[in-house]
């Protein structure tokens, strides 16, 4: 065996072996327990970053561990390859999105292979290929036939100069990224999928996701946002019109002093016809890109409509205001305002001098609304017949009264909105709907699927090529002229079902149910927590749609979810002559000075610029602190990068990139290599004979088997890969100090090395593969079994007992593991150090903690 560890050489050889033998290609095997391990697939941006490497290393560790447990392990990979970045890159590089995307896929595929990930490449998918999206289109038409798809107008960002729709990312400071024209809001028809039809099931089934992080489950519960309340009808004074309001706090109904409606509400539109100030306000609101998230921080503004609402119980008239904090697409577009008991309503009322009435008081103590609203639940007062009721009592009595009088109804509402899947972009899957000459809209017939996106296009940066090309939209359906839909799907569509397509990627149907039901659900899913409320919710929703279409037979797509933390790196900049910050890569920092706590106090780059150190932050292009994985692999080898990624931090927490830590990981692998090299060079013919072992040899063997037990639990159950690595490192310290003099010495080292290379195989597979062969094994490590703990090796022949005299440690004695108290006392009392402290005193009491402590009290 080579004495020196040469990563580039062994990694190339091992990767060639995996490729030639198709090691990780799997098929369904009913006689083996399956394990489906999946990491969220990458967008082919051009190069892998360290966040990818962490995600995929975790997945590979889990997959390889499960393989050595004897399971039939599927670990596929593919490309989430539609999306806006490809359009922008195509414009900048004067090419089309397709060649840019396919070129990136090839480059990144090579990077993944260099890192040694054990993927079944025969199942590779790219979502931008017709072979993939044809089934997405087919499924959409089936959802339409089921009544789960509909079209309605919805607001988009509109550039009036270019006459085009802009993605949110293309709006910069309220203006078009390209021509700097102020962006307007425009209502256009768009397609929606009724995720709200599954809101209750999506919410209830969160309770079945035992293997998902609580944080993700809480985020999804809040996003779905179930609430119980009352929908009630307010009349409009002086007319026969009325409008509905939903509230979760009917107990505050008697404190309503005004009503706020959205600028787009029909009543506001009517009032604006004779109110120029209101008309201007409505136009301003229409052209703002306010999202629900921004409402909390924006300035609350409004205009009185001149209309009055009639209170459904008292009949009192209260003014109706148009307000910028009410959204037409959320709820009914109108809210009852109770400034005494809602802080937003309170601030608005103060600003516009509207009355504030208190109708709820605390059960104990005084009520004070001079500075802020009282928002807690309490006891009703100033509420007529409802005085003295608490929240629950008032909710029921007021709801019952409104229902009895035909002015309201109890209602369960969800914060969740239906999923708008239309995008006015080019690089996405065409939506398979057509409009006939008579205006009828129907799905594209199945025999005309897929609706293929043309790839040979020119991007002008203004309009989607399939919108600009009037000929592309023209088609025929059943002999009639028709026009294709020119919108494309939201790219979350592709990532909502890719996990299922991996089960049968070549199937001439959406899924092969037999194969899908063998592999699904995913046993371990890995990805960032930033996907909690979008991808991970659509992922769950789509699985239920697939179930109801008879394609899968389970309720949820993934049993376990691991959300890995971000990768951080040092960030440095200097200010140039123009006063702009120039961010410098950590790799270009020539010298640093640190304080006694190891914090960087001074840094200079290769060009001599004195740098400002801003601390550790997420690797990003904007701060130029990303570390190219390929550079690290070329310098240290893939196994070193993988080992550092697993050792530096628990998987859910952020990982701080430190090249000193990478160097430490590299040194550890070299130590392992050296130990194996020394062992292989000796005569190792003597087999292990447990009956011949000395106490020292038994102690070393005990450490080996304790480590096997710990690493098995750390990787398999706890998923604490960092502590698993630490345990092996600790064992290596023992092994390096151990003698290799006798045949039994070497037999224990041999047993230990056999275990260590398998324990580390999921993390450093190239080194483990090579050392396994060098240790004389005839089978491949991939076909071996995970090491098993020898329980008898864990049994200790002796125990170390601490002896105290009057609470102070005076000696440590070794006793037989099964020694009784009398034997331990006799040995303890006979110890020379203990005798010294018992001279001239009387022993009053002896306390024995079995296997640990002998405490002598004397005076």
UniProtKB/Swiss-Prot annotation:
GO terms for biological process: leucyl-tRNA aminoacylation. Disulfide bonds: none annotated. PROSITE patterns: AA_TRNA_LIGASE_I. One of its GO terms (cellular component) is cytosol. It is found in: Cytoplasm. This is Leucine--tRNA ligase. InterPro entries: aa-tRNA-synth_I_CS, aa-tRNA-synth_Ia, Leu-tRNA-ligase, Leu_tRNA-synth_edit, M/V/L/I-tRNA-synth_anticd-bd, Methionyl/Leucyl_tRNA_Synth, Rossmann-like_a/b/a_fold, tRNAsynth_Ia_anticodon-bd. GO terms for molecular function: aminoacyl-tRNA deacylase activity; ATP binding; leucine-tRNA ligase activity. It is an enzyme of class 6 (ligase). Pfam families: Anticodon_1 (PF08264), tRNA-synt_1 (PF00133), tRNA-synt_1_2 (PF13603), tRNA-synt_1g (PF09334). A motif ('HIGH' region) lies at residues 42-52. ATP binds at residue 621. A motif ('KMSKS' region) lies at residues 618-622. SUPFAM superfamilies: Anticodon-binding domain of a subclass of class I aminoacyl-tRNA synthetases, Nucleotidylyl transferase, ValRS/IleRS/LeuRS editing domain. It comes from Shewanella oneidensis (strain ATCC 700550 / JCM 31522 / CIP 106686 / LMG 19005 / NCIMB 14063 / MR-1). Its EC number is 6.1.1.4. It catalyses: tRNA(Leu) + L-leucine + ATP = L-leucyl-tRNA(Leu) + AMP + diphosphate. Coiled coil: none annotated. Keywords: Aminoacyl-tRNA synthetase, ATP-binding, Cytoplasm, Ligase, Nucleotide-binding, Protein biosynthesis. It comes from the Bacteria. Belongs to the class-I aminoacyl-tRNA synthetase family. Its main location: cytoplasm.
């Amino acid at each position: 065996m080579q004495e020196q560890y040469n990563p580039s050489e062994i990694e190339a050889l091992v990767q060639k072996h995996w490729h030639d033998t198709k090691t990780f290609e799997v098929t369904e095997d009913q006689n083996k327990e399956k394990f489906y391990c999946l990491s969220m697939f990458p967008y082919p941006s051009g190069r892998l970053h360290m966040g990818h490497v962490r995600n995929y290393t975790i997945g590979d560790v889990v997959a390889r561990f499960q393989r050595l447990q004897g399971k039939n392990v599927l670990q596929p990979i593919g490309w989430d390859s539609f999306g806006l970045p490809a359009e922008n890159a195509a414009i900048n590089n004067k090419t089309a999105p397709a060649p840019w995307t396919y070129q990136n896929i090839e480059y990144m595929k090579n990077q993944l292979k260099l890192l040694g990930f054990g993927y079944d490449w025969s199942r590779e998918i790219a979502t931008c290929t017709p072979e993939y999206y044809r089934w997405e289109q087919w499924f959409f038409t089936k959802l339409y036939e089921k009544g789960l798809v509909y079209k309605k107008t919805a607001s988009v960002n509109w550039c009036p100069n270019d006459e085009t729709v802009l993605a949110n990312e293309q709006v910069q400071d309220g203006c078009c990224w390209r021509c700097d024209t102020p962006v307007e809001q425009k209502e256009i028809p768009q397609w929606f999928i009724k995720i709200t039809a599954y809101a209750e099931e999506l919410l209830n089934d969160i309770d079945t996701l035992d293997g998902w992080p609580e944080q993700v489950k809480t985020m999804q519960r809040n996003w779905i946002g179930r609430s119980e309340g009352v929908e009630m009808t307010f009349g409009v004074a002086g007319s026969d019109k009325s409008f509905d309001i939903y509230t979760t706090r009917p107990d505050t109904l008697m404190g309503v002093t005004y009503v706020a409606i959205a600028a787009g509400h029909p009543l506001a539109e009517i009032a604006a016809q004779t109110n120029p100030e209101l008309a201007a306000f409505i136009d301003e609101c229409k052209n703002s890109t306010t999202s629900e998230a921004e409402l909390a921080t924006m300035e609350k503004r409004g205009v009185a409509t001149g209309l009055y609402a009639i209170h459904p119980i008292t009949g009192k008239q209260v003014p109706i205001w148009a307000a910028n904090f009410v959204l037409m697409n959320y709820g009914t577009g109108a809210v009852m305002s109770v400034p005494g008991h809602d802080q937003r309503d309170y601030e608005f009322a103060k600003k516009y001098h509207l009355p504030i009435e208190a109708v709820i008081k605390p059960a104990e103590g005084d009520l004070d609304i001079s500075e802020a609203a009282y928002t807690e639940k309490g006891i009703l007062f100033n509420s007529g017949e409802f005085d003295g009721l608490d929240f629950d009592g008032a909710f029921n009595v007021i709801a019952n009264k409104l229902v009895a009088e035909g002015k309201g109804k109890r209602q369960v509402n969800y914060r969740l909105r239906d999923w708008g899947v239309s995008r006015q972009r080019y690089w996405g899957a065409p939506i398979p709907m057509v409009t006939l000459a008579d205006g009828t809209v129907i799905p594209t017939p199945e025999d005309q699927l897929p609706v293929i996106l043309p790839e040979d296009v020119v991007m002008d940066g203004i309009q989607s090529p399939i919108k600009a090309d009037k000929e592309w939209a023209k088609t025929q359906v059943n002999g009639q002229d028709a026009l294709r839909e020119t919108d494309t799907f939201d790219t979350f569509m592709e990532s909502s079902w890719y996990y299922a397509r991996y089960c049968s990627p070549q199937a001439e149907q959406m899924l092969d149910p037999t194969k899908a039901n063998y592999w699904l659900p995913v046993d371990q899913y890995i990805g960032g927590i930033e996907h909690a409320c979008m991808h991970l919710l659509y992922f769950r929703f789509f699985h239920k749609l697939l179930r109801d279409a008879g394609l899968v037979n389970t309720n949820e797509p993934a049993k376990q979810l691991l959300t890995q933390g971000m990768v951080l790196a040092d960030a440095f900049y200097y200010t140039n002559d123009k006063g702009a910050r120039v961010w410098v890569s950590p790799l270009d920092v020539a010298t640093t000075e640190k304080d006694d706590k190891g914090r960087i106090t001074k840094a200079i780059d290769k060009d001599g610029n004195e740098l400002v150190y801003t601390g550790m932050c997420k690797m990003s292009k904007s701060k130029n602190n990303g570390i190219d994985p390929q550079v690290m692999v070329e310098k240290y080898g893939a196994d070193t990068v993988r080992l550092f990624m697993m050792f530096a931090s628990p998987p859910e927490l952020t990982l701080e990139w430190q090249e000193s830590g990478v160097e430490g990981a590299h040194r550890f692998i070299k130590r392992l290599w050296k130990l194996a090299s020394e062992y292989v060079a000796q005569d190792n013919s003597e087999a292990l004979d447990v009956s011949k072992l000395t106490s020292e040899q038994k102690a070393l063997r005990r450490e080996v088997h304790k480590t096997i037990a710990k690493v098995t639990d750390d990787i398999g159950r706890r998923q604490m890969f960092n502590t698993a690595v630490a345990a092996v490192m600790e064992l290596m310290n023992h092994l390096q100090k151990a003698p290799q003099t006798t045949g039994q010495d070497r037999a224990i080292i041999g047993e230990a090395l056999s275990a260590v290379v398998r324990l580390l195989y999921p993390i450093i597979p190239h080194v483990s593969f090579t050392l396994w062969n060098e240790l004389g094994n005839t089978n491949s490590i991939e076909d071996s079994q995970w090491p098993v703990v020898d329980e008898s090796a864990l049994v200790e022949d002796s125990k170390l007992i601490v002896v105290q005299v009057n609470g102070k440690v005076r000696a440590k004695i070794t006793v037989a593991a099964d020694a009784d108290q009398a034997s331990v006392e006799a040995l303890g009392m006979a110890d020379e150090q203990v005798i010294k402290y018992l001279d001239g005193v009387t022993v009053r009491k002896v306390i024995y903690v079995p296997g640990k402590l002998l405490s002598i009290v004397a005076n």
